[in-house]
């Protein structure tokens, strides 16, 4: 039986919107936010307030309308103006979180930031402290953590926790990690950061190698208790870990992970379709959990087994994820021979 509850951090309105062609108007973001609240996600990252006036307005409106039902989060670079702007958008929420990030990998420090390790640590500490002065719920992300030298990652994480970070999010920013390697990062942090018990460990994975969900679950296996994800796996480039896949993996394999979530799984399918309709990003037919074929059976042997006992070929029920009845999950006999049909 599950013994721990995983915090589901939804970033559809921030990272998901960064999918090319997926920008949303404020009214559309509010519609998605309402669906996410009904879905039961714990944290909604509503946007990047300093990015544009529209993003600021969206975070502010989501904070005002839903900040008493979910934790509303705003993203900020480790810059004073970013943190101040994010707080301005979030301050009306009853439950709010400031999420600050700073790259820590050698390639980002050298080529993007032009900063050395000492400067990175100093900046991270100062901006986490500034965020903590505003808000008791502060998340720190060492961007590109999956490609960061582990000893330096431990140093930055320890200093960020000392400065007031309550969640430490480990991003696989470019989708480079593999499950065993990504899990080992979490294990290393738990073994080498003296104050790691004072913060929640989180995973944020991109899908460039098709491993975002697998890497996130590997992190859960090594102690992550928050997973950052998006509806339908929307996100930069190849996308993020798909929320519906994370949630149903934990629900279906609770015997293995010994974890569950607070998500109302019967709202996964309608939420998926809402996001698809608003963004214009179609859900591929064979997409796990919410694809049109997810509960369809074509092979005659499979149909025969399903008709006798659905669990022979289905590890979850359509109604568990909100698929509205068998009309959307037809069992076709077109490939069954007459003798096979008569034997069913």
Task: Describe the residue ranges of each PLM region.
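Conserved small/polar residues in nucleotide/adenosyl-binding loops
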Residues: 334-340
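Glycine-rich phosphate-binding active-site loops on the catalytic face of alpha/beta enzymes
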Residues: 224-239
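Glycine-rich, proline-tolerant flexible connector loops at the mouths of alpha/beta enzymes
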Residues: 42-67, 105-113, 170-179, 237
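Hydrophobic faces of well-ordered beta-strands that scaffold small-molecule active sites
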Residues: 8-11, 44-46, 70-76, 96, ...
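N-terminal capping/small domains of soluble enzymes
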Residues: 1-79
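Phosphate/diphosphate-binding loops
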Residues: 257-292
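Active-site mouth loops of central-metabolism enzymes
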Residues: 12-28, 77-78, 111-117, 141-151, ...
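Alpha/beta enzyme core
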Residues: 26-39, 80, 84-100, 104-110, ...
């Amino acid at each position: 039986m599950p013994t721990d509850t995983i915090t589901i951090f939804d970033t559809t309105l921030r990272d998901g919107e960064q999918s090319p062609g997926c920008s949303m108007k404020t009214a559309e973001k509010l519609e998605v936010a309402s669906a996410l609240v009904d879905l039961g996600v714990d944290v909604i990252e509503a946007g990047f307030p300093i990015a544009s006036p529209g993003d600021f307005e969206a975070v502010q409106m989501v904070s005002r309308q839903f900040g008493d039902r979910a934790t509303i989060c705003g993203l900020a670079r480790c810059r004073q103006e970013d943190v101040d702007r994010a707080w301005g958008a979030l301050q009306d929420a009853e439950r709010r979180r400031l999420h600050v990030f700073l790259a820590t990998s050698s390639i980002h420090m050298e080529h993007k930031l032009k900063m050395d390790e000492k400067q990175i640590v100093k900046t991270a500490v100062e901006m986490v402290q500034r965020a903590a002065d505003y808000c008791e719920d502060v998340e720190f992300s060492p961007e590109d953590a999956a490609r960061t030298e582990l000893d330096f990652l431990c140093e930055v994480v320890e200093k960020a926790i000392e400065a007031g970070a309550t969640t430490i999010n480990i991003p696989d920013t470019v989708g480079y990690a593999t499950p065993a390697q990504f899990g080992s990062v979490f294990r290393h942090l738990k073994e080498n950061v003296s104050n790691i018990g004072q913060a929640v460990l989180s995973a944020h994975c991109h899908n460039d190698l098709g491993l975002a969900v697998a890497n996130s679950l590997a992190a859960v296996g090594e102690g992550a208790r928050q997973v950052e994800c998006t509806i339908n796996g929307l996100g930069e480039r190849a996308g993020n870990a798909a929320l519906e896949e994370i949630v149903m993996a934990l629900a279906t394999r609770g015997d293995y992970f010994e974890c569950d979530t607070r998500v109302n799984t019967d709202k996964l399918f309608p939420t998926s379709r809402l996001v698809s309709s608003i963004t214009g990003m179609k859900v591929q037919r064979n997409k796990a959990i919410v694809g049109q074929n997810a509960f369809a059976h074509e092979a005659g042997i499979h149909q025969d087994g399903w008709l006798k006992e659905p669990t022979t070929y289905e590890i979850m029920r359509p109604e568990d994820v909100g698929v509205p009845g068998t009309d959307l999950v037809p069992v076709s006999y077109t490939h069954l021979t007459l003798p096979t049909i008569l034997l069913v």
